């Protein structure tokens, strides 16, 4: 039989191992982002701004390892009681699908929603694709890279206008351009990494 102290030691050991695992996943994902997603040069961003730093997460989020790591690290930041995750196509597509699968194998129910940039031009003319939950449900928005936050906020607005509650946006990378947009739209913003984390990462 275990004593109370032994039980506490086991619990503490499990937490320590879990923390180490999460940190190892973070390091691996950071290295993948630096190796596959980051470029240095002269670029025009989707916001129209010029930058010497460019990040395209798709070679990471659409890879088996990268998608699994993103799902593992992002699901812990999905708002409690969220029944779905959603985001603007195309950057958020692999993220919402990865989270939905991760949730299923973790005994949770979180569906994936894809927000179109424009309504479908035929049929039901949907702007939100997926197994849509009842109105009033909580949905967390996911994004790969945020610069001004406009893409994520577009998804937030579409979901809110469709009757869903959106309080949080979770991104892989925050370029740290402007955070005023989050407060203005009453959004809690969380990112796994800052741009400087990737720039400084050595591989």
Question: What do the predicted segments below correspond to?
Answer:
Residues 17-32, 156-203:
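PRPP-dependent phosphoribosyltransferase catalytic core
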Residues 15-80:
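Active-site-facing substrate-recognition patch
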Residues 95-140, 150-153:
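Short, glycine/charge-rich flexible loops or terminal/linker lids adjacent to PRPP-binding catalytic cores
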Residues 1-20:
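N-terminal amphipathic/basic-hydrophobic helices that include classical n-h-c signal peptides
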Residues 82-91:
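Short glycine-rich phosphate-binding loop at a beta-alpha junction
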Residues 47, 130-134, 161-162, 182:
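Solvent-exposed alpha-helices and their adjacent loops that cap or buttress functional pockets
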Residues 79-83, 134-136:
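Short helix-loop-beta connector
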């Amino acid at each position: 039989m275990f004593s109370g102290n032994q039980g506490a030691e086991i619990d503490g050991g499990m937490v320590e191992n879990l923390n180490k695992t999460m940190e190892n996943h973070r390091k691996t994902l950071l290295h993948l982002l630096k190796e596959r997603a980051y470029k240095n040069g002269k670029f025009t961003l989707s916001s129209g701004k010029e930058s010497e730093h460019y990040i395209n997460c798709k070679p990471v989020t659409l890879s088996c390892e990268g998608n699994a790591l993103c799902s593992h690290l992002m699901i812990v930041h999905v708002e409690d009681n969220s029944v779905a995750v959603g985001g603007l196509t195309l950057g958020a597509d692999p993220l919402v699908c990865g989270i939905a699968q991760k949730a299923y194998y973790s005994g949770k129910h979180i569906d994936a929603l894809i927000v179109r940039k424009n309504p479908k031009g035929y049929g039901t003319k949907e702007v939100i694709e997926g197994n849509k939950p009842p109105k009033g449900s909580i949905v967390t928005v996911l994004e790969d890279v945020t610069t001004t936050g406009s893409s994520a906020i577009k998804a937030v607005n579409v979901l809110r206008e469709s009757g869903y509650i959106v309080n949080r946006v979770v991104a892989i990378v925050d370029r740290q351009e402007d955070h005023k947009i989050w407060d203005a739209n009453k959004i809690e913003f969380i990112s796994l990494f800052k741009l400087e984390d990737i720039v400084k990462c050595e591989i």
